Design a protein with these regions (language model features):
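Substrate-binding/catalytic subdomain of NAD(P)-dependent oxidoreductase enzymes
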Residues: 14-260
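Single conserved hydrophobic/aromatic residue that forms the stacking wall/gate
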Residues: 1-7, 11
Length: 260
């Protein structure tokens, strides 16, 4: 069967991706979850972050998702390789040191009762959050739901633009198809690239610069593609196709480096 027929037979949607680390969806997810963890270090709590993003329309917030997948996967890999925990993984790795691995053993960012996947608050973790934040130079602060949504969704949008400019994805709509069908992005928002258009690319660039100044994190350094499209009053769908698409077996980027 041709690929399109095979995909349809198992009720899947397909897009073409360059052979590259993380492909499209997971590469964007790395930066998204890293920023959720940075918000936790800075003062927000898991349930607040999850509720803000679920209110935006995502099927599942990042901390519920990480508990579902298992907090110990990256932690065990880092221990085996002798790598130090990256900043955004400090809290998750410390939870693992305390045998809190997520749903698999009933305790992670949330607590779980036997036989249930419903998350319950874990106030006993808050002392750990305070300690890890302080040890890493953060004074915890009040963080608004607006900042939570902005920082997590902008991380997706900016990395999506980088993926598009590198030719890893051929079209902005392909990125939207991946995120709506595979990552729980709200269909009524059209996907992260369509949502960027709805926000206005000039607004997206302005907000990215704002959070780059606030956090110093290069994940918010506006993609050159975004800047160019915004300056020319264009949309994500107007991005020029990349003719010399070659597989990328490695790359350097702030949102992916040291995630594992």
């Amino acid at each position: 069967l041709p690929p399109s027929s095979a995909a349809s037979d198992v009720y899947k949607r397909q897009v073409v991706s360059l052979n590259a680390p993380g492909f499209i969806g997971n590469r964007m997810l790395f930066g998204y979850t890293a920023q959720a963890n940075m918000l936790l270090l800075e003062g927000a709590l898991p349930h607040q972050i999850d509720q803000a993003l679920e209110s935006f329309g995502l099927n599942m917030g990042p901390f519920r998702m990480m508990d579902l997948v298992g907090l110990d996967l990256g932690w065990r890999a880092r221990k085996l390789s002798g790598k130090e925990s990256p900043l955004h993984a400090k809290i998750g790795d410390e939870l693992c040191e305390q045998n809190r691995y997520g749903q698999k053993n009933g305790a992670g960012y949330y607590n779980y009762t036997e036989g249930s996947r419903a998350p319950n608050a874990a106030p006993e973790n808050e002392e750990l959050y305070e300690r890890i934040s302080q040890e890493n130079g953060f004074t915890r602060r009040e963080i608004s739901d607006e900042e939570i949504v902005d920082r997590c969704i902008l991380a997706l949008i900016n990395e999506g633009a980088n993926i598009l400019s590198e030719g890893v994805a051929q079209r902005a709509v392909d990125i939207d198809v991946v995120y709506i069908n595979g990552y729980g992005f709200p269909i009524w928002r059209g996907g992260p690239m369509h949502h960027a258009n709805a926000m206005g690319l000039d607004v997206v660039v302005e907000k990215l610069n704002k959070y780059k100044e606030l956090t110093g994190n290069d994940v918010y350094k506006p993609s050159e593609l975004l800047v160019s499209l915004a300056e020319n009053n264009l949309k994500m769908g107007d991005a020029p196709a990349k003719a010399d698409r070659k597989e990328k077996l490695g790359f350097e980027m702030s949102s992916v480096a040291n995630n594992f």
